[in-house]
């Protein structure tokens, strides 16, 4: 006798596959070395709770987006993290930025 798969079990298996395959990961920053350095500098600014450095990083990331070196989707995700840090939510911003960085795939 062949066991029957319930719809809920099948849906759970599909959802697990989608989640573990990275379909819901952060936007990718691309291969540009300058973008990598700018995001690394942003992590330092957020980690040290430095508003002035945070502003410089924000400006640099905008320049990279305008130059086509940072995809708009990645810039938007980072801008949201920066806004959160500006509101004083440094630890939450750092955690989100860390997740963004860990979610990057080498191209």
Residue spans of the language-model regions?
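Sec-dependent bacterial lipoprotein signal peptides
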Residues: 1-23
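Short terminal alpha-helical segments
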Residues: 24-48, 94-105
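Intrinsically disordered, glycine/charged-rich N-terminal periplasmic/extracytoplasmic linker segments
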Residues: 56-107
